[in-house]
């Protein structure tokens, strides 16, 4: 394994090897990251990368697709079974492209959409001005209540009544609480809007029964496959049957060309894994870990946005320690704890500075970590945040992190190949 890469391109091999070591020796706490299984990576690295397969299964524009058809059929049927969906398209290369396909399948340029503000925890593709969704469409943004820091459903209702959007978008990238999908459906119905849910962050938790499913309520559900779902990097779309043909033609040929069949194979494997009892246990443990992490950080003097979490996400307000998000990200990185700076609702700081950090427990849980490990990690995080420039303290934390990581080895079967 990797011997050919090492022989052909030493520079790339060395970069890959160093990244393998970084993943082994760091606590991965970026909420959108996770570790795929050996099987998922083997599927993605298979000969399917050589095959063009424009079109849909059994309706291809190329010959020789009989075996990739089997793979895509498996991915579609497994995905529909996991979420109880009527229609599924597994070809989107990313969550962003999945969202674009839904928008363009139903909307015209200039139509009004409503999505959660990026500044309050939404995603770029939900109508942010710098994104295509906010350029092509008239985007109205809702947010959280300043007191509770929970989605302000009264505001959502008022904005919907005022602006009459053709589509309402629910879902977020930095919102830790349960989203009331039924409430969004009720509001959408009242104003005659379609409802799209972007469940990218929560998809794995939903598959494992640890977070409510939006599928019974939404006309369209989009997602990535690589966050809590633990698959390869990619996307998918679920929809009511009546929208299936529109979705399919907007994914191909209107937005994409040939699907990535090696990635679709990896998606199929990940979907099979997501139907196991082991995956269900992982999903519930991920939420348990996040709750313990949040409580421990609160006990150490930090403020948790909204007061806690119902998911894998913990959004931390650093202002009680007079620390900025970019400072925290950099210092924690020196201690081998990988996080990302993140705006908090009503943040006075600039986006590249921020007053907060976003933490996630999915990758740690995949490694096998549990509640006591979260308590240990929380104490180390706070120790760094209180000693940003104390290299002795940061080294002590790094040593403890290395010890913890060694107790939960990552890809042990591959170590000799990557670190040869």
UniProtKB/Swiss-Prot annotation:
Family matches, as InterPro entries: PyrdxlP-dep_Trfase, PyrdxlP-dep_Trfase_major, PyrdxlP-dep_Trfase_small, Ser_HO-MeTrfase, Ser_HO-MeTrfase-like, Ser_HO-MeTrfase_PLP_BS, SHMT-like_dom
Annotated positions binding (6S)-5,6,7,8-tetrahydrofolate: 118, 122-124
Residue(s) carrying N6-(pyridoxal phosphate)lysine: 227
Protein name in the entry: Serine hydroxymethyltransferase
UniProt keyword list: Amino-acid biosynthesis, Cytoplasm, One-carbon metabolism, Pyridoxal phosphate, Transferase
Top-level taxonomic group: Bacteria
UniProt-listed Pfam families: SHMT
Biological process, per Gene Ontology: glycine biosynthetic process from serine; tetrahydrofolate interconversion
PROSITE patterns registered for this protein in UniProt: SHMT (PS00096)
EC identifiers of the protein: 2.1.2.1
CDD domains: SHMT
Enzyme class label: transferase
GO molecular function list: glycine hydroxymethyltransferase activity; pyridoxal phosphate binding
Pathway: One-carbon metabolism; tetrahydrofolate interconversion; Amino-acid biosynthesis; glycine biosynthesis; glycine from L-serine: step 1/1
Subunit organization: Homodimer.
Cofactor annotation: pyridoxal 5'-phosphate
């Amino acid at each position: 394994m990797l011997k050919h890469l090492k022989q052909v391109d030493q520079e790339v091999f060395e970069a890959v090897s160093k990244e393998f070591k970084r993943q082994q020796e760091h606590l991965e706490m970026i909420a959108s990251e996770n570790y795929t299984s050996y099987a998922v990576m083997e599927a993605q690295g298979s000969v399917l990368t050589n095959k063009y397969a424009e079109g849909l299964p059994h309706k291809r524009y190329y010959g020789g697709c009989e075996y990739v058809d089997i793979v895509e059929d498996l991915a579609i049927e497994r995905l529909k079974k996991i979420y109880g969906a009527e229609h599924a398209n597994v070809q989107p290369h990313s969550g962003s492209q999945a969202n674009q396909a839904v928008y363009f399948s139903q909307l015209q340029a200039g139509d009004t959409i409503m999505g959660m503000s990026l500044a309050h925890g939404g995603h770029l593709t939900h109508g942010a001005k710098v994104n295509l969704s906010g350029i092509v469409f008239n985007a109205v943004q809702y947010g959280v209540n300043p007191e509770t820091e929970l989605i302000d459903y009264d505001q959502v209702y008022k904005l919907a009544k005022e602006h009459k959007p053709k589509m309402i978008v629910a879902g977020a990238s930095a919102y830790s609480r349960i989203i009331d999908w039924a409430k969004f459906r009720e509001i959408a119905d009242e104003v005659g809007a379609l409802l799209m849910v972007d469940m990218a962050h929560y998809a794995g938790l939903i598959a494992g029964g640890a977070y409510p499913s939006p599928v019974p309520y939404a006309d369209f559900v989009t997602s990535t496959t690589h966050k809590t779902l633990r698959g390869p990097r990619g996307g998918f779309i679920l929809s009511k049957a009546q929208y299936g043909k529109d979705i399919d033609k907007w994914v191909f040929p209107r937005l994409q060309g040939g699907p990535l069949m090696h990635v679709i194979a990896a998606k199929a494997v990940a979907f099979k894994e997501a139907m196991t009892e082991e995956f269900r246990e992982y999903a519930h443990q991920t939420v348990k870990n996040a709750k313990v992490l949040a409580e421990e950080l609160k006990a150490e003097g930090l403020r948790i946005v909204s007061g806690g979490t119902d998911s894998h996400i913990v959004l931390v307000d650093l202002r009680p320690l007079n620390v900025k998000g970019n400072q925290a990200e950099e210092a924690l990185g020196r201690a081998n704890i990988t996080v990302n700076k993140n705006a908090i609702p009503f943040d006075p700081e600039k986006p590249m500075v921020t007053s907060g950090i976003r933490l996630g427990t999915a990758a740690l849980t995949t490694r096998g970590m549990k509640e006591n490990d979260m308590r240990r990690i929380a104490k180390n995080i706070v120790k760094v945040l209180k000693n940003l420039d104390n290299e002795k303290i940061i080294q002590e934390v790094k040593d403890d992190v290395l010890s913890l990581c060694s107790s939960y080895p990552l890809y042990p079967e591959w170590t000799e190949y990557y670190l040869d």
